Amino acid sequence: MKILFDVGNTHTTVALTENGKFFKIKRISTYSIQTEDELYAYLKVFFGETYDEVIVSSVVPNINHVFEFFSKKYAGKSAIFLNAQSYKGITWNVKIPSEIGADRVANIIAAERDYGKDAIVVDFGTAITIDILKEKSYEGGIIIPGFSMMINALFKGTAKLPKVELKPFNGFIGKDTESNIRIGIINTVVEGIGSVINKIKNENFRDVPVIFTGGQSKIIMDYKRDVIYDLELGLRGIYYFYESVVS
């Protein structure tokens, strides 16, 4: 079985798969990843004890050594780390392809494989990223603060505003401080991203799939219905990358 690690700034998604179509998934805190032995002991409860490949998409380079040690010790070989330069199925039309986050690379790889040569991908993580694929060429994108960053900025930058739990909220006007914050953040993100997507479409292409992914995309499912929600997009991208480098 192949074990995939999608390492984000806050959370890491771990998935076990044989063929890249069905995933057994566990989400853990990235901060909890300290040593290969602790990681193995924790994961074997959920996934068992045997892995033949370790494939990693990481935006936290200072813990990459843990996955390399994990792979060598428990899979008997080096880990495969996802990067743009090693994937030849897409043109990376940016100044420095090596600077593209591995999570964004995985999303674009899967978008091209599963949705076609054109796509707009929005990933709701610690930061929200928007990425553009045009004629199988990655044209760049946009990075904005994510939901949690906005909440923390309000909480830390003010004397009285509370740190709220972000959850769906109906309506456009809040009746208390917490609902004010929830409505403000959710509507700002939904309307802002909608406006950006429309501008991208107008400048590049009209008929293009718009794919929302990332764990926090679930927060806005009731607000934005004219898009595709694909929560396993990045995992499939990691697996497709693995297929390309071992073929």
Curated annotation (Swiss-Prot):
Tell me the residue numbers annotated for binding substrate.
101-104, 177
Q: What broad class of enzyme is this?
A: transferase
Its domain of life? Bacteria
| Chief site of localization | cytoplasm
Give UniProt keywords alphabetically: ATP-binding, Coenzyme A biosynthesis, Cytoplasm, Kinase, Metal-binding, Nucleotide-binding, Potassium, Transferase
Q: Which molecular-function annotation in GO is an example for this chain?
A: ATP binding
Active site (UniProt) = 103
* EC identifiers of the protein: 2.7.1.33
Q: Which reaction does it catalyse?
A: (R)-pantothenate + ATP = (R)-4'-phosphopantothenate + ADP + H(+)
Cite the binding residues for ATP: 6-13, 126
Question: What InterPro entries does the record tag this protein with?
Answer: ATPase_NBD, Type_III_PanK
Keyword set includes Nucleotidyltransferase: no
List the GO biological process terms.
Answer: coenzyme A biosynthetic process
Co-factor binding details: A monovalent cation. Ammonium or potassium.
Tell whether Nucleotide-binding is among the UniProt keywords: yes
Described function: Catalyzes the phosphorylation of pantothenate (Pan), the first step in CoA biosynthesis.
- Describe its assembly: Homodimer.
Q: Which HAMAP family match?
A: Pantothen_kinase_3 (MF_01274)
| Family to which the UniProt record says this protein belongs | Belongs to the type III pantothenate kinase family.
Q: What is this protein called?
A: Type III pantothenate kinase
- Which gene carries the instructions for this protein? coaX
